[in-house]
């Protein structure tokens, strides 16, 4: 039972599978048929659309349509299939028309441009522009006046510019200096009253301290004066910021050497009025009767400079010197006005107890520092006001102190210095008042001498400037190198451009032109149509030959064009009637090809045959018009078209005949010139003239032939004797003569140079002998001619 159940199950499974197989539908070719029908219909539509564009003159659209149709049919049937012949033919025809359009042979090369619309737009634009003929005389005069006014304004502007340029730059500088001088006068006038009051107070205080110093005892040893300049209350700004500087307190302390007691302390406060400080202010040393005071306004951390004074000095000299100095300072500060200068610090310094300088006094200064010496009045003298930049000769405090060793002449020297300083200050004040606001701003440059620090800074500035110049030069050299690199790049660029141009040319060469592509398409269509034996296919092949001939004419291959037209004509004569218009067209194209190839006789013959075909066609159409009374409109229209073609063809015939005549004339002229050039060297007149010339030289007295020979001896070319023999020949002759002179037999072996020289002489002698022989032969020939 189990076996039977399994067998039935297997049979049932086989039946089910068979049913399933029968239910599966068989593959059908309906889809392929639909696709093929779609391709064929699409190709036909594209062909019709392309022909429509071709008739309408839209050549690029026609080319695209025919190209797509040919590609569809080529993919389906193959490129050499019969179904593709028509598409290839029309595609090649449209490409030919496109090439003609691009070359400017027929139509406008621009796509979709209508000449009529352009002309209309031009007329509209021209109407908007004013015409010179339409302008009245009044309008012209107004325009002229406007032009003249504009020209005059331009000339005036040029003159003013020239005048402004002609002004010297000093005017501008003076203006700026005037403004600066006015500002400085305002600042000085405000601060002039305060220093005077402060000076009075300081002098009173100094007198009190001097009296106390007199009462004090001096038990031991010399005094040591240390001048300390305290830190300024405010930091000194740069000259660019132009800020004022607060006053400095100078403390003068007298100490004992070797642990001795202090005799007294003198504090001298020097009030400086606010002033504009330059970048580097010099150290001002004021010296009076052995007192050395150093004011250092620039440094923020001033140092203590001790002054060693050796020995004691009588108190009387100190008192008298202090009193005289105080009086001089009061007279100067009270009796004169403050000059308007940039830097005019007024310093009043009095030492309460200062001893005169004796021999062996030592003053410690900063190493290498020069301090310009100013007079006691403390004011900037004439150079500071007038602008005279003659510097004051710097002297160190040591030199000043050594000069004042003799106590007797100290007062006289101080007075001699104070008197001219006062006179100079008075003169400077008067000059400053006369000058007014026109004081030059360059006064500050001559007011102070340059300290060594200034020199060091100047040297540093020069070094920095040199470095900057070197940097600039380096940048310039780098820039020049970059420019050279850029120039090299620009030089390399043309090479790259040349390569690009070459590559473009190669690409253009690789890209097939429209004429070449048209030739390929038409040739392929010709092959496809020629293998078909039907009349329609053969006529298409004839048309393919015709278009191939036109392509050859466009490419100026006239021989190939004649062959193509001739093959087209042969096919058309087989399948067409004698009065068909296609024959007339072929004859016309063939005549053009002959004319381009300078075969005017054949061209005239082909044009005349074309006229015959057209006349035959007109006769046939006239007969058809007579027969068909109602439907004669089409025939009449064709007759009119043919009549319009006849004058053009006749004109071509006349042109060919005229060119033939001109060609014949040119050919005759060319032949004549060639004949004249060939016979010009052998004219009979030349020989006669030479004979007559020789005959005229004959003697008339009947002399013998020997006399004739002697008469024509001038015709014989004589040997030319060299004027100066070469040094080589002289050396050779000397070399030959030397062995004979020395007693030799002359059979000495010559050297290599002598052998070469001998060979050269022999060659020259042979050439001369040949020339003489030729001359004698010519003379004999002339004698024979004269004898005859």
Swiss-Prot record:
Localization: Cytoplasm; Nucleus
Gene: NASP
Pfam families: SHNi-TPR, TPR_8
Name of the protein: Nuclear autoantigenic sperm protein
Biological process annotations from GO: blastocyst development; CENP-A containing chromatin assembly; DNA replication; DNA replication-dependent chromatin assembly; male gonad development; nucleosome assembly; protein transport; response to testosterone
Function according to Swiss-Prot or TrEMBL: Component of the histone chaperone network. Binds and stabilizes histone H3-H4 not bound to chromatin to maintain a soluble reservoir and modulate degradation by chaperone-mediated autophagy. Required for DNA replication, normal cell cycle progression and cell proliferation. Forms a cytoplasmic complex with HSP90 and H1 linker histones and stimulates HSP90 ATPase activity. NASP and H1 histone are subsequently released from the complex and translocate to the nucleus where the histone is released for binding to DNA.
GO cellular component: chromatin; cytoplasm; nucleoplasm; nucleus; protein-containing complex
TPR repeats: 43-76, 542-575, 584-617
């Amino acid at each position: 039972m189990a076996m039977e159940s399994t067998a039935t199950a297997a049979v049932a499974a086989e039946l089910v599978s068979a049913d399933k197989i029968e239910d599966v539908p068989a593959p059908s070719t309906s889809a392929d048929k639909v696709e093929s029908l779609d391709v064929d219909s699409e190709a036909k539509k594209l062909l019709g659309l392309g022909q429509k564009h071709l008739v309408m003159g839209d050549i690029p659209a026609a080319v695209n349509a025919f190209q797509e149709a040919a590609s569809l049919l080529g993919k389906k049937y193959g490129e050499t299939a019969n179904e593709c012949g028509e598409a290839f033919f029309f595609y090649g025809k449209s490409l030919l028309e496109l090439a003609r359009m691009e070359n400017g042979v027929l139509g406008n090369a621009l796509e979709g441009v209508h000449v009529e619309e352009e002309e209309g737009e031009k007329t509209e634009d021209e109407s908007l522009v004013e015409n010179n003929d339409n302008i009245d005389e009044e309008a012209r005069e107004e325009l002229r006046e406007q032009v003249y006014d504009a020209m005059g304004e331009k000339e005036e502007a040029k003159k003013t510019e020239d005048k402004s340029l002609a002004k010297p730059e000093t005017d501008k500088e003076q203006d700026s200096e005037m403004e600066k001088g006015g500002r400085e006068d305002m600042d000085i006038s405000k601060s002039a009253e305060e220093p005077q009051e402060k000076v009075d107070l300081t002098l009173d205080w100094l007198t009190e301290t001097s009296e106390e110093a007199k009462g004090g005892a001096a038990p031991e040893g010399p005094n040591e004066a240390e001048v300390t300049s305290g830190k300024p209350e405010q930091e000194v700004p740069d000259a660019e910021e132009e800020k004022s500087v607060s006053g400095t307190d100078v403390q003068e302390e007298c100490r004992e050497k070797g642990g001795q007691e202090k005799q007294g302390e003198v504090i001298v406060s020097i009030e400086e009025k606010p002033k504009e400080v330059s970048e580097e202010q010099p150290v001002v040393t004021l010296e009076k009767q052995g007192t050395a005071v150093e004011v250092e306004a620039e440094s923020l951390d001033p140092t203590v400079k001790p002054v060693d004074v050796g020995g004691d000095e009588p108190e009387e000299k100190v008192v008298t010197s202090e009193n005289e100095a105080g009086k001089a300072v009061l007279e100067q500060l009270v009796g004169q006005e403050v000059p308007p200068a940039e830097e005019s610090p007024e310093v009043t310094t009095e030492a309460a107890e200062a001893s005169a300088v004796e021999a062996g006094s030592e003053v410690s200064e900063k190493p290498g520092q020069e301090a310009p010496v100013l007079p006691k009045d403390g004011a900037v003298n004439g150079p500071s006001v007038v602008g005279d930049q003659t510097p004051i000769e710097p002297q160190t405090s040591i030199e000043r102190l050594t000069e004042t060793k003799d106590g007797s002449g100290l007062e006289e020297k101080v007075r001699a210095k104070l008197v001219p300083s006062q006179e100079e200050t008075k003169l400077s004040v008067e000059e400053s008042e006369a000058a007014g606001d026109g004081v030059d701003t360059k006064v500050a440059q001559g007011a102070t001498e340059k300290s060594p620090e200034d020199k060091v800074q100047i040297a540093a500035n020069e070094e920095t400037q040199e470095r900057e110049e070197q940097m600039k030069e380096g940048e310039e050299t780098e820039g020049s190198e970059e420019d050279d690199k850029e120039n090299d790049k620009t030089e390399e660029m043309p090479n790259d451009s040349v390569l690009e141009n070459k590559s473009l040319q190669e690409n253009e060469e690789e890209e097939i032109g429209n004429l070449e592509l048209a030739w390929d398409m038409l040739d392929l269509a010709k092959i496809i149509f020629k293998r078909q034996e039907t009349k329609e296919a053969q006529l298409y092949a004839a048309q393919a030959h015709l278009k191939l001939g036109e392509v050859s004419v466009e490419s100026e291959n006239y021989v190939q064009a004649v062959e193509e037209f001739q093959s087209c004509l042969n096919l058309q004569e087989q399948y067409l009637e004698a009065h068909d218009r296609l024959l007339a067209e072929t004859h016309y194209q063939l005549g053009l090809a002959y004319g381009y190839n300078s075969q005017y006789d054949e061209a005239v013959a082909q044009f005349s045959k074309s006229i015959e075909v057209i006349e035959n066609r007109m006769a046939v159409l006239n007969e058809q018009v007579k027969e068909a009374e109602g439907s004669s409109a089409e025939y009449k229209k064709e007759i009119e078209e043919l009549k319009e073609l006849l004058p053009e063809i006749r004109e071509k015939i006349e042109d060919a005949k005229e060119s033939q005549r001109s060609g014949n004339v040119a050919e005759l002229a060319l032949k004549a010139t060639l004949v004249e050039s060939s016979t010009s060297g052998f004219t009979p007149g030349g020989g006669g003239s030479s004979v007559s010339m020789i005959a005229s030289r004959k003697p008339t007295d009947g002399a013998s032939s020997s006399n004739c020979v002697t008469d024509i001896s001038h015709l014989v070319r004589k040997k030319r004797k060299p004027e100066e023999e070469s040094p080589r020949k002289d050396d050779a002759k000397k070399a030959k003569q030397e062995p004979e002179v020395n007693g030799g037999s002359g059979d000495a072996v010559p050297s290599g140079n002598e052998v070469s020289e001998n060979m050269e002489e022999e060659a020259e002698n042979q050439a001369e002998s040949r020339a003489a022989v030729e001359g004698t032969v010519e003379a004999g020939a002339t004698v024979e001619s004269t004898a005859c």
